[in-house]
Amino acid sequence: MTKTKSKKNMIKRNKMDEKQEKEQLTMKKNKKIFIITFVICISILAIFLVKKTLQNDTFYTIKIGKLILENGIDMKDHFSFHSNLPYTYPHWLYDVFIYLIYLIGGYTGIYISSIVLFLILIYFLFFALYKITNHLSISAFSTFIATLSLSGFVTARAQLVSFILFALEVYFIEMFLKNGKKKYLLFLLLISLVICNIHLAVWPFYFIIFLPYFAEYILSLIVNKKKDNKITLFLKKRFDLDVNSNIKYLFLIMLLSIFTGLITPLKGTPYTYMIKTMMGNSQKYIAEHQMITWSSSPFVIIMIFEVYFLSLFTRVKIRDLFMITGLTIMAVTSIRHISLLALAGIFCFARVFALYFINNNLIIDNTIINFMSRKKSVICTVLVTIMMAGGIYFIQGIKNPDYIDTKTYPVLATEYIKDNLDYKNIRLFNEYNFGSYLLLNDIPVFIDSRADLYTKEFSGLDYDIFDDYKSITKDYQKVLKFYDISHLLIYKQYPGEKELSTFYIILKDNSNYNLLYEDDNFALFEKNNDEDIIITYN
């Protein structure tokens, strides 16, 4: 009787083990289907989100990359007609990279490189978020939010590479705090070195990302050493305040990273660039330095709201709140910081989401995976993604069907100048937005989107070229006389505007300027005589 009962129990256990093993195999299979489906869908979406039309910085990037390979880095400007302006080459390594791609594949190659870099960023985010949260569905959803949030910043600029580097930085910090492996510290040093050479302007943000971790460590030390009171009890209840001794190694690495600024061909520029930029007046004029318009960043708003809202109902890591709060304050002051908020903030977004489900015993990951791995779900998901991507591409194609937007960049006017004028010896006043396109075509410019080059802080001049450009319609005769301008290429109509530009009307009505060329968007004038104006700059 006992043997029979024991045998039955063994059979029952074997059946349970077989059932459990079968469920595990099914779950493993469903996870593979989920991952493959997600990767396909997010890839389709990302590819169609990348704008085909090139941005103005790309043009000077190509030209500077060529200059570096041919002549090296001499810390001088070679493309404006202003004499002996110093130039910092803030993303020299990326310039070389883009020029080499341009040599191989032209504008198409550059467009493809932007897609590839964006895909690398997205794939890595998905991988990193899964490693940190251990929730596949939350990682996928968070990656989707990040893709939409960052898509507006994806273009052939050095920032696209720096996005990948910052994502790596957050991941390496998290992994080091989790398992203490020293290899992550070496990777962090390497990231600092690469940023110094590939996108110098954002190097200070490398150090900013460390700050929430240090703040959490200091607060944890204080709370754990103090006697319990209302404040400490509240903090212990609401936040995970375990003291991680690995933080001291992170602090050491951050200090060592400061010296990576010496390992560049740019001399001491890494230590002065941000200070000079903040002191310069380009902050007043450049769009990416302006205050954020929240209506244009809905997915970032969703991310911020979710972190704060869920932190009310679950115990979270306080570094996530420090990170989100600090980056939100930065984003309010400057649009360029919204990308850093979207990038670093997505790690906080995913972790808070995961902690909410864990702390409230909401086991939904497997349920979502099983549902989304069904045949009908996979087909519907792919079809919806294709429809979304097609709609995005159709809209973008209507707005900007080509690599070069002829309403923004004077393609035909440039051809006219090169065919009819001694273009290398004229002193051409031009608009900021298309100066880079002119210098790509070997036409010396008055100004271009290397904005800092033309401020007093960088030029060392006692007058400000950028200020003079912005005030041109107020006192154009004085400005044109001071810079000995012989020709002017300006917008006849600014992109998106229906009215003629004020400066075009002024010059058209002035008999001292001859209209040499015009089309629907641009006009080229030549000055035909000088006026007696005394020029003084205080």
Where are the language model's segments positioned?
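Short hydrophobic alpha-helices at membrane interfaces in multi-pass membrane enzymes
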Residues: 175-193, 248-251, 318-325
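Short periplasmic/luminal acceptor-recognition loop of GT-C membrane glycosyltransferases, typified by
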Residues: 420-459, 486-493, 525
